[in-house]
Amino acid sequence: MNLARRVAWNTLAQAAARVVTAGLSIVTTFLLTRHLGVSGYGVYVTVMVYIPFFVVFFDAGLTTFVVRSLSVDEARSNVFRDALGLRIALALPMTLVAFALAMLLYRGGGEATTRNAIAIALPLILFMTVASAVGVLFQARLEMDRVATAEIFGQAVAASLIVLVVVSGLSVYAAVGAAVTGAFANAALLLLLARRIESVRPLLAPRRWAALLRKALPLGLSLMIAVVYFRADAVLLSILKGAHAVGIYGVAYRLLEAVVAFPGFLYVSVFPLLTQAAARRDLDNLRNVTQRAFDVLVLAAVPVVLGTIAIAPEIVDALAGDRFDAAVTPLRIVIVGAGLMFVNGLFAYVLIAVDWQVTLLWTGAMTLAFNLALNLVLIPRYSYNAAASVATASEALMLVTLVVLVMRSAGFIPALRVAAKAAVGGAVMVACLAVTPSNLALLVVVGGCAYGAVLLLLRTHASLQLRQLLGAKR
């Protein structure tokens, strides 16, 4: 299969996986909000935000570093096995840290449920670590359809078990156990698939581990900072305002997680192309790939952001019921930040490709300080609305900074021709939604048709020039 078809297939496979997993996530949210109630659902969201934090935090940049190494030199298979061994070796101490910190942060008498649920979820750290470490092998080979298959399988297992939890009337502990089992299924299938193309026996090599950490750490610190400020709002909200506030915010947050997962399939497809263009110092090709990816991301973000703002009450009511009506405002706020994250992620990968990790680190540190300071000041008074506002403000600050950095490092200034067409389509879509009866399915169909029709009339597909992206040099 040639490069164009491989990139297209990877993109399609991951997009399909995101649709399926997002659908399963919506189903589980629908079930759990009604079964557990606001506070119970708040405990579940707290756990699902808290545990993955440690997986990404202790990634130390290894995932992206290994992908970059394997993309440039496929013969360096030991890098994969070294990183796999290192990630597994880090899993035990990170699990202990996660447990100890949970006992400290949620030590109140009324927070026993949260503490116990986190303890049940601790195996997630190992399973998610293995899945992440093995997934890089497929990412570097542009075979992300395997990762997509495993992700769907794991989500399906978890969703099936959550249905049993609800039918059986079990507690939040059983719901957390279902998520752990789904993560195990995902990791196990990835290991089985990886064995067909590479040995998955971890290498015990402390000296090479140290060298890996030294090389990956600048990037790792940037990613650590990014995950802290992405998850800090929900964690701080759970500490400062309790499970009920997290339950309300959790509806918006879970939708945010589902939405921002979609651009990931494009990032992982174009990152090897960006890396190789940067390694050849082919800035024209790098800018071309970046522009085409930027256009696709903007086209996707505009209807998501404007559509969600327009029909947020219908979304919340359908997803969680009238007990969660207060989630409408934070949803409208965080969805703006989600749209900004589409583009921010791409620009961050461009900086990584051109070896500007240290600069990216300082940018993330500045944004994190901004985020934490505002959250600590505003959450005690404004609760989940403050958390949502700070998250979106942080993404806006990050966008401005990244645009400047990408311009300086790669000479890239985004052309806004496609973005302008998307804005016109979005405006027409919102106008159509304003006169459409309040039925979620009907609103989604009308909005999608209106947006798509405007894009076709403006011949937006001709402006995308996707063949240039798919035909980028490798």
Question: Over which residues does each language-model region extend?
Answer:
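Interhelical loop/hinge segments that connect adjacent transmembrane helices in multipass membrane
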Residues: 1-7, 172, 188-230, 234, ...
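Signature of the first transmembrane helix
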Residues: 3-63, 95, 99, 106, ...
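Membrane-water interface segments that mark the loop-to-transmembrane alpha-helix transition
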Residues: 8-22, 47, 59-103, 116-119, ...
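Small-residue-rich midsections of specific transmembrane alpha-helices
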Residues: 18-28, 45-70, 125-133, 186-189, ...
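Alpha-helical transmembrane segments of multi-pass membrane proteins
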Residues: 53, 57, 92, 96, ...
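Specific pore-lining/lateral-gate transmembrane helices of multi-pass inner-membrane transport
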Residues: 69-86, 248-365
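Hydrophobic alpha-helical transmembrane segments
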Residues: 118-119, 150-196, 215, 365-371, ...
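Membrane-proximal transmembrane or re-entrant/amphipathic helices at the cytosolic face
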Residues: 415, 434-474
